[in-house]
Amino acid sequence: MAILLQKSKVMKIAGMSLAMLLAACSSDQSYKRQVNGDYAYLEAPPLKALNVPAGMILPLQNGEYDIPPTISKGLIGKELDIRPPSQALALLSGSRTENSIKSSKLLLENTPENSNLWSQINNVLLKKGDKISQRDDANQTLVTDWIEWQRTDEDVPYQTRHRISIAHQNYQIELSVANEGLRQGGQQVTDPVEIQRYNALMLNELIEGVNRQRERMSDNPAAHNLGPLDVQSGGDTSGLPQMIVRAPYNIVWDRLPAALEKVGMKVGNRSRSTGSITVAYKSLSTSEWKSMGVNEPSISEGDYKLQIGDLNNRSSLQFISDKGKPLTQVQNDELVAVLKAAFSQTAGL
């Protein structure tokens, strides 16, 4: 019995020690960049000559153990970073990575699974809240605004801007992340090690986000409808123009808020049972319409009611102004192209 109690106490102590160690590691990660775990070595007293009392005879000096005076020119303290370079992770099926000072790349097979990579990348950035300063969807290239990295192993957070692009080759797709700016505390940083580190970190966040989207799609059969939705022009029984989306009502209902916000329509009240959504439309800038690859629609800014109809495996969309007037045929056809692009660029949300 005494032996069992002693073993139980040992296990409890070991468990408490492990918990304290994990808690310490999770709260303070600065040890990752410190020599010997802390900066106590900076407080070591300097060497000085031995003060021999008068009358004491010292043994003969042996130079074998002398420590010659040196002047250190290397980095010390917080200036010295012992962290290894960050590496991009090849989490996606059939992928591999390449890292260089200029950029971090993910190379994938040119397969149907990777055909929506650009929209998936945009979804990751949207969910992270990263703002875009430049976008060219036609060439699948964008430049982010400044992104602040809150990391526990940095005393002062870094801010970065990145150029993210996708290049299609015969049998390969290349996702590239390059540096467009790096600063810390308002000061520009040109250290190639830090540039490569944050390129790899950004690429890893994109890869992890895309991987989560694909895992969600594989776990949920209905999620396969997260891809682009086909939108066509049509008319109701009275001949008024409307849009036809080739997807079931439930899918369209869930996808609409993100698509509407994408084109400048702020979503208000929603009623799933009646299929109605109120929106307040404010047009995007010329550059934003251009980045979407569509022309600015001619509808007026203001409040609209969007009526969604259930057509079994399809859905109908009809916009009605606050004065109760439906769109003209021209306006309806313009929104067909706009919403088709919006559904494509918000796929996965």
Swiss-Prot record:
PROSITE patterns: PROKAR_LIPOPROTEIN (PS51257)
Single GO biological process annotation from the record: Gram-negative-bacterium-type cell outer membrane assembly
Bilayer topology term: Lipid-anchor
Lipid anchor positions (N-palmitoyl cysteine): 25
Keywords: Cell outer membrane, Lipoprotein, Membrane, Palmitate, Signal
Residues lipid-modified (S-diacylglycerol cysteine): 25
Gene Ontology, cellular component aspect: cell outer membrane
Cell location: Cell outer membrane
Function: Part of the outer membrane protein assembly complex, which is involved in assembly and insertion of beta-barrel proteins into the outer membrane.
Subunit text: Part of the Bam complex, which is composed of the outer membrane protein BamA, and four lipoproteins BamB, BamC, BamD and BamE.
Family designation: Belongs to the BamC family.
Name assigned to this protein: Outer membrane protein assembly factor BamC
Originating species: Photorhabdus asymbiotica subsp. asymbiotica (strain ATCC 43949 / 3105-77) (Xenorhabdus luminescens (strain 2))
Lineage of the organism: Bacteria, Pseudomonadati, Pseudomonadota, Gammaproteobacteria, Enterobacterales
Gene: bamC
